[in-house]
A protein has these predicted regions:
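Short, conserved loop/helix-junction motifs that constitute active-site signature segments
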Residues: 82, 108-114, 139-141
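Active-site-adjacent alpha-helix of alpha/beta-hydrolase-fold enzymes
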Residues: 26, 136-142
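Solvent-exposed loop/turn segments at secondary-structure junctions
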Residues: 11-13, 49-51, 94-97, 124-127, ...
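N-terminal beta1-alpha1-beta2 submodule of the flavodoxin-like/Rossmannoid cofactor-binding fold
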Residues: 1-87, 97, 104, 161-168
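Conserved strand-to-helix beginnings and helix N-cap segments that scaffold or border functional pockets
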Residues: 100-103, 129-132, 157-160
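Glycine-rich, charge-decorated loop segments at or immediately adjacent to ligand/cofactor-binding or catalytic sites
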Residues: 125-138
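Glycine-rich phosphate/pyrophosphate-binding loop and the adjoining helix
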Residues: 144-169
Length: 169
């Protein structure tokens, strides 16, 4: 069987080392592309139907509201068939100390039952926050969720050794 890299990423203003910085390509996309280069896995980007603002403050506020209301933001486009894949590398930024709720939308609409899920995230703090626990809970035992990889967005150039180690597990 084969692997697929499914990720949600955000372009726009981000906070890097406490300072605002505009990103033309989201950190999670950069990490997903690194995984693709090392594995050859198919890439699929989750895109939101209603785009997030490029202003960090507004993205953070929307993420908080979506988290608190368990919102399921709509996905733009068609969700691919995943029947030919046994492993899903699932990537996202950490927003409001967890994964964006659009990941739940994807989980509900995609055919992921029985898949191996290998989560990866980018963040400014170096941790998954509560994302790994929440993701495992949301998947409710229907999948095997492996240990994830968390990378500081501003250290993407320094993560190759950790990435290769994670991929080998």
């Amino acid at each position: 069987m084969a692997s697929v890299i499914i990720y949600f990423s955000h372009r726009g203003e981000n906070i890097v080392n406490g300072h605002p910085l505009f990103l033309s390509k989201g950190n999670t996309q950069v990490l997903a592309e690194k995984i693709h280069k090392l594995t050859g896995a198919v890439l699929y980007e989750i895109k939101e139907k209603e785009p997030y603002s490029e202003v960090y403050e507004y993205v953070n506020e929307r993420a908080r509201k979506e988290y608190e209301t368990n919102a399921l933001p709509e996905i733009a486009g068609i969700i691919p068939s995943l029947g030919n894949f046994d492993t899903i590398y699932l990537g996202f930024p950490i927003w409001y100390r967890t994964y964006p709720r659009i990941i739940n939308t994807f989980i509900q609409k995609a055919e992921i039952k029985g898949k191996i899920i290998k989560p990866f995230c980018t963040n400014d703090e170096g941790s998954f926050g509560t994302a790994e626990l929440e993701l495992a809970s949301y998947l409710k035992g229907a999948n095997t969720v492996k240990a994830g990889l968390s990378v500081n967005g501003y250290k993407l150039d320094e993560c190759d050794a950790a990435l290769e180690k994670w991929l080998s597990k």
